[in-house]
Amino acid sequence: MNRTHLAFSKTGLALATLVMISACATQPPAPTEDRSVAEQVRAPAAEQTRGLQVYPLRNPAVTELSQAALAAEQAGDLDQAALLLERALRIQPRDPELLQHMAEIRLERGEWDQAENFAARSFDVGPRVGQICQRNWRTVALARERLQRYDEAANARERLQECQVEPPVRL
Amino acid sequence: MLRRLLIHTILFLFGLSLGAGLPWVWWLDREAERRFAERQWTQDSRIYARPLELYAGLELRLEALVVELERIGMRAGDPSRVGRFSQQGPRINLHAPAFRFPDQDQGAQRLRVTIRNGVVEALERSDGESLALIRLPAAELGDLLPAGSDDRTLTRLGDFPPLLVTGIQAVEDRQFRHHHGVDPRGLARAVWTNLRRGALVQGGSTITQQLVKNLFLTPDRSLIRKLNEAVMSISLERHFSKGEILEAYLNEVYLGQDGAQAIHGFGRASEHYFGLPVQALDVDQIALLIGMVRGASWYHPVRNPERALKRRDFVLGQFLNTGLIDAGQHDRLIARALDVATHRQRRQRPNAAFLELVARQLRRDYRDEDLRGTGLRVFTTLSPSAQLAAERGLARGLAERERQPNELQGAAILVEPSSGEIRALVGDRTASRRGFNRALDARRSVGSVIKPFVYLLALAQPDRYTLVSPITDGPIDVELPGQALWQPRNHDDISHGEVALMDALANSYNQATVALGLEVGLPALYRLLGQLGIEPGSEQHPSALLGAISLTPLQVAQLYQPLAAEGYSAPLRAITQVVDVDNREIGRYPMRLRPIREEGALALLDFALRQTVLDGTARRLPGLLDQDPGVRGKTGTTNDRRDAWFVGYTRQWLGVVWTGRDDNAPAGVTGSATALPIWAEIFRPLSHRPQPAQWPNALEWFWIDWPQARLASEDCQNALAVPFIQGSQPLELSDCFEPASTSRRSRGRRR
C-alpha cells in the first residue's frame, strides 16, 4: 500500500479559527429520536452469543452510572443518558461498553459522525470480537449509511462479519 | 367671628388635604402594587467547578480531598454539623451540604471516606452503608460578569430554615402575622421615644415597612417618607400575602458587602459568611445573620466581631424568650465563638485565567444581557485541586529558577486527554491577578515542541520511515527564493552525523529534523496542524520545522491532546453545561471525538516521546517525580533562550508549561532546565494511576541492535525492543544475532 500522505480524517470538524478553545457550540437537537436505530445495533448482536465474548471488569460506580444511563434512555431522556455516560467515561475513559453505549445514544440523537467516532473508539479499545464488536461495526455502518457514505458502510458491514470468532476449545 | 374663621380654616385645610391626599394615597397604593408585582431581582450568574465524584478505587490523595472540601466551603470541625469534616488517620468524616445539580437536588449527607496510599479504599454513609458513588457539591469559582452593585441567591420561603423564618419575626416584628402593614403600637412607642429625645432615633418599622423602604424609598428619615412608607406598606398587605412579603424581605434585606457588591438576602449572606447554603445553617449562625439586619456594617462579624457576638447573643436571648430554643440550647450556643469563613474572599480567589476562558466562550455563544444578572449556573471542567497544584507549581518553580526576582512569567494548563476537559489553567505567576492571560493570549514561538508532528508525518509512511531509520544530522543549506540561504544549526552547534530517527527526536537535533521535514514536506506539516485545529498562518517558511511558529499555550495543549488520547482528537472544553435559574438546561457542551486515523504512527511517536523522557532531552524528569507513571514529553527552547516549553502527558493528564519574559527578551530559560522542573512541580501533587501502555495490534516488536537498523537478539549488548508497523522492520541482521533465539518479543527494553 502506497501511503505517501497522512490520511487524516477529512470528515472531522473544521475547527474554528478561534482556536483558543475549539469547543462545539450548543448541540442542535436531534432531528428525530431514532430509537429504532439503536435497537438495530443491539438486538442482532444480542442474538449471537455463541462466539467468544469478552467482558471487562466493571467499577461499581461505573455500573451505577451506566444503569442510570440505560434507564434514562429507556425513559426517552437522551440528554440525561449522555450526561450520565460522560460521567462514567470520566471514571473509565477506555471502557468499550460505555463508549459503545454513547455511540448508540448519539445514533438515536441523529449525530451520525459522533456515533461513528465513539463506536470506532470503542472498537479500538475493545475486545474486537463478540457482541460489542458487532455493535461497534453495526453502528459505524448505520452512521455511514445515514451520511450517505455507502462504500464505507459496506466496508463496515464486512468488518462486522469478522467479529464472530469461535471460542477456544476447552480441554 | 374668630371661631367661624377657625372652623372655616380647618374645613378648608381638611378639604385641601382630602383633595390632594386622596389622589396621593391612591397613586402610592397603585405604585406599591405595581412595583412589587413587577420587581425583578438580579442574581449573578455563577460558575462552578466540576463536582468531584468519589468512588472506591479513585486515585485521590488525602490532601487533595481536603482542598476539594475546602473549596466547596467546608471546614475542619465536628462533622455532626453540616459543612464540617474531620480527619482521623486515613479516614475523613464529612457532612456535605446540600447541592442543586442540574439533574438532581441532592440533600446534605454524612459520609466516611477512607483513603490509603492515594486511593479511595472505602466510601460509606455514616451509618456504615457502603456506597458505590458520591457526587460532592460543586465548588463555586466566581461570578460571570457581575451584574453591578447587587448580589443575591434567591431562595423560596419554603427553602429557608423554619427557625430563620420565625426567628426574624421574633426579633424584628413580633406582630407580623397580625398587623396590616403598620403596627400602631410599635409606631406609638417609636413616636413617644422620638418626641422624648427630640429627634428621630427609633423606627417602629414592621417587616413590611422595612421591605417597602428597601425596595421603593430613599433612606432619609423624613416624616413624608414615613407617611409614604406606611401607606405603601398597608397597600402591600392588601394586595399580597404574608408569605409573599416575607419571602421578598428575606431575599432583599441588606447584609453587608462583598467587595463592591452589596449582599442582599439570607441566601447569599449564608454563602458569603459561612460558605454554606442557607438550609445548612446552625442556630447560632442564623442568630448572627438576623442580628446583622439592624446594621450589617455595625455588627459585621469580621470587622466588628465583639459587637457582632454581643448582638448574636442578644438574638439568641430573643429566641429563648419566645420559646424558639430552650435554656440548655441557649447556654450551649452562646458559648460558641463566631464562626465565619474569613478566608472566603471570593473576589481575590484564584482561577482568574480560567474564569476568563469560560466568560469568553459564553460571550461567543450568548448575548451579554442573557448572561448578566440572570442567575445562570455554569458548570465547568475545572478541578480545584489540580488548579491549586498548577498555580503553586508555576509560582514556586519560577521563583526558584529566575535570574532576578519577578523576571519571568509563565502559563500552565492541565487537560484530561480523553475528554479534552480543561482541569486547570494559569495565565500569570500570580494566579489571582486579572489582566494579560498568557495561557490564552501569549503567542510565543514553540521551538522544538513542534517536532513530534514532523516525525508523525514521517512515521505515517512505514515503507519509508521507522523509528530506527537512519537520518543525517549535518550542515544543511536551504535555498529560499529571494531570501538568504537558511542554515539551521543544532543547540550544541555539533552535527551528529547519521542518527536513528527516534534518537534525532529524543535529542531534539535540529539539522536532522529539517532534513526529515523537507522530505515529508512543509505543506504536509501545515495541513496536519490545520487538521488538529491550529492555524499557524499561510506563509510557509522551513524554519517552522524547528518551531518558528507562534502559538498560545492553549493551542499547544490542543495540538498534543490527540497524542495523549491514543489518536482521538477532542476539542478542548471548559464548560459542560449551563442551566438557568430554574435549573432548566439552556446550553450543553458535549464530549466530541474525531479520530486521527494513524493509529500505528501515533503509537510509534508515543514510544519515541517516552524515550525522550527516559533517554533524551527530558531525561531529568523521572528523577524529579516520586514515581514516574510513564510520562511522555517534549521540551522546547527558542532562539536566545527567550521561551521555554515542556509538554508532558500520561493517559490521565496532559500538561503544558510555558515560561519566558513578557517583553520577549532573552530570558535565560530552557525547556529542560526551566519548564520541565516546573512541570514536574505541578505534576507531583496530582493523583494518577500507573497504566500499562496498550499498544495497537498493528505493531510488532523486535530486538534492534540500537542505533543500527539491524535485528538483534535479546542478549545483544545494545539490544532495544522497538515497535514497528507490521512488515516495516529492518531485514538486515546484526553481527551478534543468534539464529537460535527468537528476535521477536512482545514488549521490553534493555539497553
Where are these regions (language model features)?
Chain A
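Bacterial Sec signal peptide processing site at the extreme N-terminus
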Residues: 18-45, 171
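Alpha-helical segment of the N-proximal tetratricopeptide repeat
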Residues: 55-83
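TPR alpha-solenoid repeat register
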Residues: 98, 132, 136, 169-170
